[in-house]
Amino acid sequence: MRYDRTIIAKNGREIHLRNADAFDGNAIQELFQLTHGETDYLLSYPDENKHDLEERSRLLAEKAESPNAIELLALDGSKLIASAGIHGVGTKYKVSHRAEFGISVLKAYWGLGIGRALMEACIQCAKDAGYVQLELDVVADNTRAIGMYHKAGFVEYGRNPKGFRSRTGAFQEVVSMRAEL
């Protein structure tokens, strides 16, 4: 699945949205470290990245050629500022119609429409891949993201009051959402 588009962010900057490929491994690793270190809304901590560069590059190459999965990047000039992607929930027939969506945007770029553009691109890619349902989990306190998801047609279908546990011992409620495509 291929994607390549330029958008204008709310700050007037041109942002290039494109597929990740095997050569983006280092930049994606750096983005992971930054985004996962500056907010508690994401699934993991910076030190929990489980892929080395070789493994990450292999996975990115596979995703770049996949007909039903995609990893998209947002670049401000040559600076990687966000990533988003979809992948199937599973390979069994009974769940083959469902995909999961994930996204991370550098905090300095929140509120500029970049997350929305990546999400809309992923929704279109999910439709093109033949999925009929797109799913995500979001921390309940992340009201900006939840509002964006609602506007895109996602609906809440469940809550887990102890969905995430932080290293401080506190819990975060996680909202499960889905959109019919």
Regions found by a protein language model. Name each.
Residues 1-11:
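Short acidic N-proximal helix/loop "leader" segments that mark the beginning
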Residues 20, 105, 138:
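Hydrophobic adenine-recognition pocket in adenosine-nucleotide-binding enzymes
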Residues 135-138, 150, 155-172:
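Conserved catalytic-core motifs of GNAT/GCN5-like acyltransferases
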Residues 11, 30-47:
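Helix-loop element at the rim of GNAT/NAT acetyltransferase active sites that forms part
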